[in-house]
């Protein structure tokens, strides 16, 4: 794929200069030096008197420069050193944001009030409340914020809390880039990962629990890419116990496990995931089982229209109607079925009925899944769930933002389209309060990702035995 001037327009100047310097230092420059020497000699000058400037770009042929930039943008080999530079730059950006941008109070005080009740001995979930409402997240959320409660002087040291939240942000970013590298993604996809205003806000300005859930999600994806099935299930289930949004990955995880391990081991890992939920919830389950399940995994929760980011353009009456809710549920199920038959089961070489029959008759032969396929399957399941969700709030961007560049790349779109959709999506999620136009863009950007993956069912595969650095 030719990037041409697109690379020049999208890669920041400092990164380009650094890349050129490293390329000139690390690649053999003898041929270029001979050409320069011959040119100088033809002008009657002494070769030793010529001292080329390191940054003199005029001495580099335009085609050579474009090739250099194209290689920088498209060759996964460069991810190894570009990613750490971007993470370092983002760490500086986080520090500047914490220093210069005021903290926004939304749920932090409520979280601290709820945790205070828990630490005081309350174990009935229905009685744990704060100033903005009852506790509606599973047990791991309570444990994490209990630690933060102690570290931040009962929630009063906001600056320290922001610094602590920068740690999971940068950790998640590092894991995300590792997942991209494992999948053989080109370096031009890395830049959008560090430029999201909304992501920085979710983590270090609003202190939402979605940051910890997103970290668990990406660690699980990384472990699945490494074929660490048990560890991946444990981390994913722990993430579900922080926020149940991670249940959107469950269909993809089931497919990946069954394809890789067959039916019985997959059922055992599913039981392990359930067991983790029980173990984490024991302090609350033992006091009020129904209350804990109803509050922490409330699937029938009625969302308020004024906070929705995605479906505002349909109007409040339709948004709140049961028919609309059922239609989205039907669409969700239909898309999962379509993806299972057309995309996710492709490695098995079987249609869905035949695949199920082989599993039940224990005749199914497991397959080795590529890291690219595993990541695409899990993130497409996430995108389907977000597209069909009746209400998305701003903090849900913590799950979507880092998935979008990879999904758009997997659709086969040109890099310009990838960047355009990322920019449109970022714009829409930064409009507050949401408008009919911004919510429409949110839905369209998700639809582009889902339909694009469905249309290009094979995606972009990187062979597992490839000699390239990124899969070693």
From Swiss-Prot:
One of its GO terms (molecular function) is dol-P-Man:Man(5)GlcNAc(2)-PP-Dol alpha-1,3-mannosyltransferase activity. Its main location: endoplasmic reticulum. Its EC number is 2.4.1.258. GO terms for cellular component: endoplasmic reticulum membrane. It is a multi-pass membrane protein. Residues 1-5, 102-131, 179-201, 260-264, 345-371, 417-436 are lumenal. This is Dol-P-Man:Man(5)GlcNAc(2)-PP-Dol alpha-1,3-mannosyltransferase.
């Amino acid at each position: 794929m030719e990037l041409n001037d697109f690379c020049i327009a999208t890669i920041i100047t400092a990164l380009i200069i650094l890349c050129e310097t490293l390329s000139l230092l690390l690649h053999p420059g003898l041929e270029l030096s001979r050409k320069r020497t011959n040119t100088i000699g033809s002008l009657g000058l002494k070769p030793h008197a010529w001292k080329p400037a390191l940054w003199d770009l005029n001495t580099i042929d335009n085609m050579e420069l474009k090739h250099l930039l194209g290689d920088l943008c498209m060759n996964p080999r460069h991810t190894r050193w570009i990613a750490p530079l971007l993470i370092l730059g983002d760490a500086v950006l986080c520090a500047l944001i914490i220093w210069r941008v005021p903290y926004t109070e939304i749920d932090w005080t409520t979280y601290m009030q709820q945790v205070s009740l828990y630490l005081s001995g309350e174990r009935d979930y229905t009685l744990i409340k704060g100033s903005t409402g009852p506790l509606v997240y599973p047990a791991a959320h309570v444990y994490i914020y209990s630690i933060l409660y102690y570290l931040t002087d009962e929630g009063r040291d906001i600056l320290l809390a922001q610094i602590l939240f920068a740690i999971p942000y940068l950790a998640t970013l590092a894991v995300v880039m590792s997942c991209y590298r494992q999948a053989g993604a080109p370096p031009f996809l890395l830049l959008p990962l560090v430029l999201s205003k909304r992501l920085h806000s979710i983590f270090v300005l609003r202190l939402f629990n979605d940051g910890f859930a997103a970290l668990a999600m990406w660690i699980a994806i990384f472990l699945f890419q490494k074929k660490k099935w048990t560890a991946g299930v444990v981390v994913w289930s722990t993430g579900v116990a922080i926020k149940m949004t991670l249940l959107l990955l469950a269909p993809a995880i089931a497919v990946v496990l069954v394809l890789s391990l067959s039916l019985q081991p997959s059922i055992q890992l599913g039981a392990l995931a359930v067991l983790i939920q029980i173990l984490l919830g024991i302090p609350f389950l033992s006091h009020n089982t129904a209350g804990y399940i109803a509050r922490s995994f409330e699937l029938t929760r009625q969302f308020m229209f004024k906070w929705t980011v995605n479906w505002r353009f349909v109007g409040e009456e339709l948004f709140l109607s049961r028919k609309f809710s059922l239609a989205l549920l039907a669409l969700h199920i239909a898309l999962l079925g379509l993806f299972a038959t057309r995309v996710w089961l492709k490695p098995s070489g079987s249609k869905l009925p035949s695949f199920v029959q082989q599993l039940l008759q224990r005749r199914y032969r497991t397959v080795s899944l590529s890291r690219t396929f595993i990541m695409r399957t899990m993130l497409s399941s996430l995108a389907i769930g977000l597209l069909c969700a009746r209400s998305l709030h701003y903090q849900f961007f913590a799950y979507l933002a880092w998935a979008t560049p990879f999904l758009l790349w997997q659709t086969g779109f040109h890099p310009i389209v990838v960047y355009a959709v990322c920019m449109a999506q970022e714009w829409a999620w930064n409009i507050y309060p949401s408008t009919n136009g911004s919510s429409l863009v949110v839905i369209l950007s998700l639809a582009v990702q889902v339909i694009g993956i469905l249309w290009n069912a094979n995606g972009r595969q990187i062979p597992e035995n490839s000699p390239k650095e990124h899969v070693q």
